[in-house]
C-alpha cells in the first residue's frame, strides 16, 4: 500500500498542475490607474510648472557642520557580543571608525563635484518635483540613440549607477545603437518630492515615471530596475505595454498563487522546476524561507510603522549609517555576516557608500523612502492584483548568485510571457549595478540588442 501511495502521489500532483494553472489562467482585469492623480499640496494644483529645470546637488556648509556636530556628540554604543560579526546587525565596534571617517575624512566638496558629473534636472509630475539624471551620449550619424529608464531601489539611490553609466552609454562598432540614460530618484527618495497623502505605491509610481518619460518626449523606451525598481518597472510593463518595449531586471519575481504552487511542486520534484546546477538557489524551501524570515524584519517595520523608526534615523547619522550599511553587507553576500567588519570593503570604498548615505541624510528622506513599503504592501495595492496580470513586453533577467530570492524561467514565464533570456552569473548580490557595473552594463546592452531584433522598431521621439 505504501509503495502504491509513493507512486500515486507524484502522479496526482503532476496531473493537478495543468488543472490548477488552467483555473488561474484567467487574469484579473487591468486596474484603472489615474494618470493625472495629484500627489502634491492641493493648493498648488492650479499652479503646476511643467518646465524641466537643471538641478545641482549641494552639500551646504550649514548641513555639513550640523552633521559633524551630531557625529561628535553621539552617545557610546552598546558593545557587540563576542564573535558575532554582523549577524546581529551592524557591529558597533566598526561604527566609530566609519563615523570618524564621515566627519573628518570624507571630502564633502570633492564628492559633491563627483555627484554632479552627470546632468541633473527636476520637473513637476502630478504635483511632485521629480529629480532625474539624463545622460545623452555623442554618437556618429549612423548610430541610433535609444532611451533607457534606469530605476533604483531601497536603500540605494541613483548613486548605484554612477560606475555603470560610462559602460551603458559607450558607443561601440558592434552596436548600431547607444543608450541615453534617464535615472530618476523615486518619489520620496533623495531629491524627489514625497507625496503629501497616503496611496503612492509602486503602481502609482509607475504612472509618475510614464508621465516623466512623456514629458521628456519619449513615446517608447526600455526600462531596467532592481529592488523597488524591479517592482515599479514590472508595473510599468504590465500597465503600459505600448510604451515599454523591453524590460530588464536583476530582481524579477512573481508572487502569484501559481508561482507559489510551482515552487512547492519543485520542493518534491526539483528537476521539474529548476536546472540541477541551480537547485540550491531555490531549495530546500525551508532553508530559503528561514533566510528570508531572518532578513525581512526591516520590511515588516517599514510596511507597518515607517515613521516611528524613521524618526531615529532622521535624527542620528550613526543610526542611519548602521541601518543602511548593514544591508549593503548582508545583501551583497550573506557570508559577509560572519566577518567582523561586515565585508563592506569587499566591493566598495567608504566614499562610495557614504555618497549614498548623503543622498538620504542631506535630504532628510529616509522616512519618506520607507513609506513606499507601507503603501505597496497595503491591502489596497494588493487588490490591484498586478502580479497576476501577465506582462506581454519582452523581458530579460539577470540572476546573481547572492540575490535575496531566485525563481527559474518556468516560474517567471507565468508572469513574463515573453521572457527572452535569463542570464545566470556566479557572483554578485542585491546591488548588482553598484557591485559589478561592467557585467551589469554588458548584460543590459545585450538584452536591448535582442529586444531590438525581436521588435525591429525605432524608439519614437
Swiss-Prot record:
Assigned EC number: 3.3.2.9
Keyword terms of this UniProt record: Aromatic hydrocarbons catabolism, Endoplasmic reticulum, Hydrolase, Membrane, Microsome, Transmembrane, Transmembrane helix
Catalytic activity: cis-stilbene oxide + H2O = (1R,2R)-hydrobenzoin; 1-(4-methoxyphenyl)-N-methyl-N-[(3-methyloxetan-3-yl)methyl]methanamine + H2O = 2-{[(4-methoxybenzyl)(methyl)amino]methyl}-2-methylpropane-1,3-diol
pH dependence: Optimum pH is 7.5-8.0. Activity decreases rapidly below pH 7.0 and above pH 9.0.
Annotated TM spans: 4-24
Tissue-by-tissue expression: Expressed in fat body, foregut and midgut but not in brain, subesophageal ganglia or silk gland of larvae on day 1 of fifth instar.
Domain of life of the organism encoding this protein: Eukaryota
One annotated GO molecular function: cis-stilbene-oxide hydrolase activity
GO cellular component, one term: endoplasmic reticulum membrane
One Pfam family linked to the record: EHN
Major location category of this protein: membrane
Membrane topology classification: Single-pass membrane protein
GO biological process: catabolic process; epoxide metabolic process
Localization, UniProt: Microsome membrane; Endoplasmic reticulum membrane
Temperature-activity profile: Activity increases as temperature increases from 0 to 37 degrees Celsius.
Summary of subunit composition and partner proteins: Homodimer.
PANTHER family for the chain: EPOXIDE HYDROLASE, EPOXIDE HYDROLASE 1-RELATED
Function: Catalyzes juvenile hormone hydrolysis. Degrades juvenile hormone III (JH III) about 3 times and 5 times slower than juvenile hormone I (JH I) and II (JH II), respectively. Degrades cis-stilbene oxide and trans-stilbene oxide about 18 and 43 times slower than JH III, respectively.
Family: Belongs to the peptidase S33 family.
Protein name, per record: Juvenile hormone epoxide hydrolase
Source organism: Bombyx mori
Amino acid at each position: 500500500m505504501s509503495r502504491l501511495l509513493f507512486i500515486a502521489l507524484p502522479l496526482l500532483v503532476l496531473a493537478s498542475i495543468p488543472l490548477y494553472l488552467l483555473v488561474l489562467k484567467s487574469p484579473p482585469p487591468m486596474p484603472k490607474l489615474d494618470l493625472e492623480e495629484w500627489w502634491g499640496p492641493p493648493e498648488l494644483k492650479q499652479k503646476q510648472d511643467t518646465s524641466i529645470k537643471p538641478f545641482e546637488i549641494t552639500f551646504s556648509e550649514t548641513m555639513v557642520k550640523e552633521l559633524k556636530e551630531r557625529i561628535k556628540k553621539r552617545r557610546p554604543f552598546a558593545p557587540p557580543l563576542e564573535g558575532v560579526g554582523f549577524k546581529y546587525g551592524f557591529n558597533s565596534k566598526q561604527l566609530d571608525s566609519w563615523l570618524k571617517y564621515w566627519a573628518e575624512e570624507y571630502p564633502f566638496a570633492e564628492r559633491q563635484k563627483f555627484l554632479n558629473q552627470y546632468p541633473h534636472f527636476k520637473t513637476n509630475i502630478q504635483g511632485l518635483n521629480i529629480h532625474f539624471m539624463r545622460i545623452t551620449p555623442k554618437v556618429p550619424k549612423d548610430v541610433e540613440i535609444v532611451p533607457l529608464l534606469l530605476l533604483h531601489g531601497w536603500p540605494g539611490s541613483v548613486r548605484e549607477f554612477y560606475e555603470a553609466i560610462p559602460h551603458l552609454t559607450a558607443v561601440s562598432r558592434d552596436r548600431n545603437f547607444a543608450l541615453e540614460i534617464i535615472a530618476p530618484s523615486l518619489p520620496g527618495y533623495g531629491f524627489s518630492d514625497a507625496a503629501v497623502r497616503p496611496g503612492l505605491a509602486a503602481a502609482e509610481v509607475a504612472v509618475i515615471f510614464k508621465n516623466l518619460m512623456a514629458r521628456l518626449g519619449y513615446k517608447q523606451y526600455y526600462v531596467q530596475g532592481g529592488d523597488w525598481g524591479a517592482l515599479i518597472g514590472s508595473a510599468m510593463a504590465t500597465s503600459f505595454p505600448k510604451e515599454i518595449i523591453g524590460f530588464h531586471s536583476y530582481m524579477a519575481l512573481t508572487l502569484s498563487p501559481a508561482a507559489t504552487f510551482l515552487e512547492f511542486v519543485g520542493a518534491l520534484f526539483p528537476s521539474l522546476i529548476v536546472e540541477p546546477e541551480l537547485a540550491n538557489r531555490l531549495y530546500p524551501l525551508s532553508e530559503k524561507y528561514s533566510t528570508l524570515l531572518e532578513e525581512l524584519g526591516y520590511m515588516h517595520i517599514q510596511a507597518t510603522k515607517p515613521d516611528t523608526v524613521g524618526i531615529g534615523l532622521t535624527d542620528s547619522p550613526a543610526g542611519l549609517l548602521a541601518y543602511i550599511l548593514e544591508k549593503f553587507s548582508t545583501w551583497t553576500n550573506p557570508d559577509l555576516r560572519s566577518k567582523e567588519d561586515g565585508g563592506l570593503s569587499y566591493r566598495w570604498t567608504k566614499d562610495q557608500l557614504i555618497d549614498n548615505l548623503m543622498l538620504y541624510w542631506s535630504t532628510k528622506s529616509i522616512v519618506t523612502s520607507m513609506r513606499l513599503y507601507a503603501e505597496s504592501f497595503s491591502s489596497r495595492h494588493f487588490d490591484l492584483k498586478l502580479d497576476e496580470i501577465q506582462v506581454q513586453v519582452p523581458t530579460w533577467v539577470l540572476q546573481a548568485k547572492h540575490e535575496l530570492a531566485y525563481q527559474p524561467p518556468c516560474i517567471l514565464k507565468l508572469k513574463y510571457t515573453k521572457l527572452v533570456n535569463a542570464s545566470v552569473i556566479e557572483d554578485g548580490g542585491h546591488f548588482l549595478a553598484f557591485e559589478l557595473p561592467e557585467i551589469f552594463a554588458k548584460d543590459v546592452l545585450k538584452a536591448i540588442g535582442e529586444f531590438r531584433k525581436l521588435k525591429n522598431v525605432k524608439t519614437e521621439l
